[in-house]
């Protein structure tokens, strides 16, 4: 029997990853193509969509060189990508200007103006953040009116790749939920919100679920890459939802905490549970009739790396000094607001601080405070998600910070839930995208395909320190109003 393969393409900010897996979800291999970001002015962040295609070609050429037979057997392709980017296309299908990326802050005034219109939070379930797509178009309308007048379609980054792959203008729910134009509960474009930014539904791609077929690979590309048969392209997902598909975080009660540069607490939901006033993202998931909530802190390992630079010690050495056994908080409190904070404060101007320093506060005590500060910021996220109706009974930890068992014990104890460490493997967005490609091509049950990884180890809350951690969290939580009065 012929063995089919499935390809996941993840378009990140710094590169594209192409991952090949078989029908048993065994990863055959992966390859990358690198990308640069252009920053022509302060706060601007752009990429040329032609560079995405070149990077995708590089990554797929890498797979073809190493795994030509396997690439030839590809039956399904899934897409994942950086969210929120505004790719503007004219009536001839040409790109009008460089894509304005998710981390571009030029449209902060336009975002504030749209967010002041109560319809946006009511319909989308989210704050209109400067990084989202709608304020970018409002900025273009105001500052580049000749370009805005030529806009025929607005595409998110991965959906521009789909246009190249298939010739189709299609998006899906999880990525589109980050535009500020989607009626997130109804899973459809809002004509009302589009009109508020001078657009209408004809400017938008058609919508499918992430598990649906959303085009077929063009014969020219199939021939170039040596793909023999018909290759279906799935709807795919935004990067966080694709990662959740890779992690198996697709059912009510499933959650993961990501300790990267920033921190994310992501929970899958069987229903739509918006709470924009807590700066919780309430988005559609990549699977039908599923949503997700996400809390974001802007400095997770970033805070530890900052402290590492101050002390001249590596992050691993600093956390190693604490040992494996969780310690009671010392009374030193760290607020990790080094570049502002997202959830629950939505405050770009707030800045970090150490509180409670004394002669006894040595390097070890401050390391402990930094880890606890990030832990308590994640606890703030948990409380925000709980207030919106989400229940989390355990979390899976991913990201560079998850290598510290001490840090995970701190998180388990403060959140009051077990923290699972997955066995080694690739559970990222490219793997999640490949899973969506498999589902679209075969009609397999998404919940059966998107299983959770094997657990290598579970870290339980330290019951004896529960009270001390709760007291320290309350102290941390009370700091924000005082720090805010000094930061603004």
Predicted regions and their residues:
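A structural motif corresponding to the C-terminal end of an alpha-helix
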Residues: 196-203
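Active-site core segments that coordinate phosphate-bearing ligands/cofactors
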Residues: 6-8, 108, 112-127, 138-170, ...
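Short, basic and Ser/Thr-rich N-terminal targeting/leader segments
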Residues: 12-15, 73-75, 80-82, 133, ...
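Alpha-helix termination/capping residues and helix-transition junctions
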Residues: 68-71, 80, 201, 249, ...
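Short beta-strand-loop/turn "lid" adjacent to the catalytic site in phosphate-handling enzymes
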Residues: 67-102, 127-133, 162-183, 206-209, ...
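N-terminal glycine/serine-rich phosphate-binding loop of ATP-dependent small-molecule kinases
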Residues: 1-98, 122, 150, 222-223, ...
């Amino acid at each position: 029997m012929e063995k089919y393969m499935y390809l996941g393409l993840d378009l990140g900010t710094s590169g594209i990853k192409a991952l090949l897996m078989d029908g048993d979800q065994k990863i055959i291999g992966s390859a990358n193509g690198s990308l640069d970001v252009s920053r022509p002015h302060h706060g601007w962040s752009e990429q040329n969509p032609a560079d995405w295609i070149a990077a995708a070609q590089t990554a797929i050429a890498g797979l073809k060189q190493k795994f030509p037979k396997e690439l030839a057997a590809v039956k399904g392709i899934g897409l994942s990508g950086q969210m929120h980017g505004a790719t503007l296309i004219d009536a001839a299908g040409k790109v009008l200007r460089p894509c304005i990326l998710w981390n571009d802050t030029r449209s902060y005034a336009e975002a504030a103006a749209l967010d002041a219109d109560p319809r946006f939070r009511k319909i989308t379930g989210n704050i209109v953040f400067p990084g989202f797509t709608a304020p970018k178009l409002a900025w273009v309308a105001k500052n580049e009116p000749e370009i805005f007048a030529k806009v025929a379609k607005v595409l998110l980054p991965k959906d521009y790749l789909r246009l190249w792959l298939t010739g189709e203008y299609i998006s899906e729910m999880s990525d589109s939920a980050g535009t500020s134009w989607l009626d997130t509960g109804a899973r459809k474009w809002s004509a009302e919100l589009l009109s508020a930014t001078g657009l209408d539904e004809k400017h938008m791609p058609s919508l499918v679920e992430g598990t649906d077929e959303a085009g077929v690979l063009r014969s020219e590309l199939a021939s170039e890459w040596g793909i023999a048969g018909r290759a279906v392209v799935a709807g795919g997902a935004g990067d966080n939802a694709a990662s959740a598909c890779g992690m198996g975080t697709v059912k009510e009660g499933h959650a993961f905490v990501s300790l990267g540069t920033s921190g994310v607490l992501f929970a899958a939901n069987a229903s739509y549970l918006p709470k924009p006033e807590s700066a919780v993202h309430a988005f559609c998931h990549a699977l039908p009739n599923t949503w997700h909530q996400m809390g974001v802190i802007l400095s997770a390992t970033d805070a530890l790396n900052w402290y590492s630079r101050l002390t001249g010690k590596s992050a691993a050495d600093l956390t190693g000094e604490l040992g494996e056994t969780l310690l009671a908080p010392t009374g030193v409190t760290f607020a990790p607001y080094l570049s502002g904070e997202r959830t629950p404060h939505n405050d770009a101007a707030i800045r970090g601080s150490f509180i409670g320093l004394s002669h006894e506060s040595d390097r070890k005590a401050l390391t402990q405070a930094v880890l606890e500060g990030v832990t308590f910021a994640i606890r703030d996220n948990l409380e925000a998600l709980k207030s919106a109706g989400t229940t989390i009974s355990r979390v899976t930890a991913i990201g560079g910070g998850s290598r510290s068992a001490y840090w995970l014990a701190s998180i388990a104890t403060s959140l009051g839930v077990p923290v699972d460490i997955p066995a080694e493997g690739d559970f990222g967005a490219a793997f999640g995208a490949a899973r969506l490609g498999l589902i679209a091509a075969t009609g397999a049950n998404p919940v059966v395909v998107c299983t959770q990884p094997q657990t290598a180890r579970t870290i339980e809350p330290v019951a004896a320190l529960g009270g001390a951690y709760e007291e320290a969290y309350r102290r941390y939580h009370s700091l924000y109003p005082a720090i805010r009065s000094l930061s603004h």
